[in-house]
Curated annotation (Swiss-Prot):
HAMAP family: CH60. PROSITE patterns: CHAPERONINS_CPN60. ATP binds at residues 30-33, 51, 87-91, 415, 479-481, 495. Keywords: ATP-binding, Chaperone, Cytoplasm, Isomerase, Nucleotide-binding. Its EC number is 5.6.1.7. This is Chaperonin GroEL. Gene3D superfamilies: GroEL, GroEL-like equatorial domain, TCP-1-like chaperonin intermediate domain. GO terms for biological process: protein refolding. It is found in: Cytoplasm. It comes from Cronobacter sakazakii (strain ATCC BAA-894) (Enterobacter sakazakii). Forms a cylinder of 14 subunits composed of two heptameric rings stacked back-to-back. Interacts with the co-chaperonin GroES.
Length: 547
């Protein structure tokens, strides 16, 4: 086992604080509308330019192992805030640095670290409740656009694009961000349920100008099996032909004689048919077939539950207003499924999301919810160069997370004002002893740090602005972009409650642990023995005299 280097008490805390400050100082230059960019060197390719706190934090590794431990613990704050709300990483880092700095001063002055931590925890619990009380719902497109704009570093086009996407696919819809091909940002919206399977034969195409199959008010047959024998399908085909409607077949596969017969029938105009493979594989395919069945009011024909294709009737088939199939995708628009059944299915999938352990599973389940509940929107980010594209894409993703958080828990006044108001309301809060009271004061003082940093980045004097904001009340604050005072919500400067809450909770959690640190242990650097061995070989030169 390698030898260890151990530091105690103030020596350990000073080193740890130095690491915290290096990381936090690098991250906090990005905060606010006048925050600056950070350039990150990559081992290959062009450097990355970013204004995203967590991206900066992830790149930082320090040479001194004790300092690095401090930096890594604050990096955890940024990562956790990012995982919980998708934004607010810089705010969380600034709060953590402020709590640690003030807390360690109190420890150096002889306060009990454990009581300090209890005081900080008590203040944060009370602050979270006050934040919830200040929160207002974020329901209209204007508010959503404002949240998106603020999070995308005051880029109004991004805010409007996200608001438009949310309006079109609903709050539950999936919105994804991709790299575009042009200079302009674009929004593509897919209404209804779309899955990545195209037609099984190009002979099904009935719109040659677009290369697509379009079926109006079709019946939809769902089969969890391979169909190769046409005899199994004859009863259903005859019933559909009598009804005079088109038919979409979604099955594990349609092949051989069955596919050939369907193609011939379609080309002769006897019955309008199209066939596609079911989406997904294994259990996921079964689940997605069931989703389509509920959306279209049909039944999955499956031998597992004793159903046979020959005995299927029109009652077993789903229906939709329209189906569009191209080479790679199938879109079912306006399924006739029962609304309460669809909501029940959505609730069931949400339960699975709660229990999912892997991010991949969670993402796939969320896609299924979106396909049932709304639709899918794709924001294609446009930029002149690849470096700008990456930076802009990261900003759009941040803005998207922030707007989702705003819809979920509402919004509070932005620009660090909400935390200042919360701190003002908690001045009467007390702990069980004097050390806990100091802990409460440490937390309340730290809540001013985001406002001060935003002002500092804008080139103004933080103390003057902080005092002016504290003298006001409600949503009165300082707009660093225009250098004006006023009502933050009226000026469109909003922060999602969830983002502010998460930043405060994660910052205080890690900062509290760091304040109570008394000893740090790390590996001693290893000496390079190979060099010593090589140097020792020099004596071999004397062997020449042995002759």
């Amino acid at each position: 086992m390698a030898a260890k280097d151990v530091k105690f008490g103030n020596d350990a805390r000073v080193k740890m604080l130095r690491g915290v400050n290096v990381l936090a100082d690098a991250v906090k230059v990005t905060l606010g509308p006048k925050g600056r960019n950070v350039v990150l060197d990559k081992s290959f390719g062009a450097p990355t330019i970013t204004k995203d706190g967590v991206s900066v934090a992830r790149e930082i590794e320090l040479e001194d192992k004790f300092e690095n431990m401090g930096a890594q613990m604050v990096k955890e704050v940024a990562s956790k805030a990012n995982d919980a709300a998708g934004d607010g990483t810089t705010t969380a880092t600034v709060l953590a640095q402020a709590i640690i700095t003030e807390g360690l001063k109190a420890v150096a002055a002889g306060m009990n670290p454990m009581d300090l931590k209890r005081g900080i925890d008590k203040a944060v619990v009370a602050a979270v409740e006050e934040l919830k009380a200040l929160s207002v719902p974020c329901s209209d497109s204007k508010a959503i656009a404002q949240v998106g704009t603020i999070s995308a570093n005051s880029d109004e086009t991004v805010g409007k694009l996200i608001a438009e996407a949310m309006e079109k696919v609903g709050k539950e819809g999936v919105i994804t961000v991709e790299e575009g091909t042009g200079l302009q940002d674009e929004l593509d919206v897919v209404e209804g349920m779309q899955f990545d399977r195209g037609y099984l034969s190009p002979y099904f195409i009935n719109k040659p100008e677009t290369g697509a199959v379009e079926l109006e008010s079709p019946f939809i047959l769902l089969a969890d099996k391979k169909i190769s024998n046409i005899r199994e399908m004859l009863p259903v085909l005859e019933a559909v032909a009598k009804a005079g409607k088109p038919l979409l077949i979604i099955a594990e596969d349609v092949e051989g004689e069955a596919l050939a017969t369907l193609v011939v029938n379609t080309m002769r105009g006897i019955v309008k048919v199209a066939a596609v493979k079911a989406p997904g594989f294994g259990d996921r395919r079964k689940a997605m077939l069931q989703d389509i069945a509920i959306l279209t009011g049909g039944t999955v024909i499956s031998e597992e539950i004793g159903m046979e294709l020959e005995k299927a009737t029109l009652e077993d088939l789903g229906q939709a207003k329209r189906v569009v199939i191209n080479k790679d995708t199938t879109t079912i628009i306006d399924g006739v499924g029962d609304e309460s059944a669809i909501q029940g299915r959505v609730g069931q999938i949400r339960q699975q999301i709660e229990e999912a352990t892997s991010d991949y599973d969670r993402e796939k389940l969320q896609e299924r919810v979106a396909k049932l509940a709304g639709g899918v929107a794709v924001i294609k980010v446009g930029a002149a160069t690849e470096v700008e594209m990456k930076e802009k894409k990261a900003r759009v993703e941040d803005a998207l997370h922030a707007t989702r958080a705003a819809v979920e828990e509402g919004v509070v006044a932005g620009g660090g004002v909400a935390l200042v108001r919360v701190a003002a309301k908690l001045t009467e809060l007390t702990g069980q002893n004097e050390d806990q009271n100091v802990g409460i004061k440490v937390a309340l003082r730290a809540m001013e740090a985001p406002l001060r940093q935003i002002v500092s980045n804008a080139g103004e004097e933080p103390s003057v602005v902080a005092n002016n904001v504290k003298a006001g009340d409600g949503n009165y604050g300082y707009n660093a972009a225009t250098e004006e005072y006023g009502n933050m919500i009226d000026m469109g400067i909003l922060d999602p409650t969830k983002v502010t809450r998460s930043a405060l909770q994660y910052a205080s959690s890690v900062a509290g642990l760091m304040i109570t640190t008394e000893c740090m242990v790390t590996d001693l650097p290893k000496e390079d023995k190979a060099d010593l061995g090589a140097a020792g070989m020099g004596g071999m030169g004397g062997m020449g005299g042995m002759m």
